[in-house]
Amino acid sequence: MSGTIPHFWAQPFRYIRWSAREKPAYFYSCVIAGLGPVFLTVVPPVRKYFGDVNPAPIPVTYPIPTGPRKQLTGYDDDTEEA
């Protein structure tokens, strides 16, 4: 184990190496978080290059049929006039 903990602003590369060994969860979570903005700019063109398209949106309403509706008979509906 090293003697003293390096300070980030004094020795940034030494601090990064130290944190990768001593606190890997924090180190790799910062690495993944730092790659987020890069992925936002790189991934969409790569998806488009490989032909991946977004799926059609899921319908949120029932489609209304076109044309007139059929009048039902024989189900005790003759009391209601449309």
Swiss-Prot record:
It is found in: Mitochondrion inner membrane. Its main location: mitochondrion. It is a single-pass membrane protein. The keyword Glycoprotein does not apply. GO terms for cellular component: mitochondrial inner membrane. Belongs to the complex I NDUFA3 subunit family. Keywords: Electron transport, Membrane, Mitochondrion, Mitochondrion inner membrane, Respiratory chain, Transmembrane, Transmembrane helix, Transport. The lineage of its organism: Eukaryota, Fungi, Dikarya, Ascomycota, Pezizomycotina. It comes from Neurospora crassa (strain ATCC 24698 / 74-OR23-1A / CBS 708.71 / DSM 1257 / FGSC 987). Accessory subunit of the mitochondrial membrane respiratory chain NADH dehydrogenase (Complex I), that is believed not to be involved in catalysis. Complex I functions in the transfer of electrons from NADH to the respiratory chain. The immediate electron acceptor for the enzyme is believed to be ubiquinone. This subunit binds ubiquinone. PANTHER family: OXIDOREDUCTASE 9.5 KDA SUBUNIT, PUTATIVE (AFU_ORTHOLOGUE AFUA_5G08980)-RELATED. The keyword DNA-binding does not apply. Complex I is composed of about 40 different subunits. The gene is nuo9.5. The chain crosses the membrane at residues 25-43. It comes from the Eukaryota. This is NADH-ubiquinone oxidoreductase 9.5 kDa subunit.
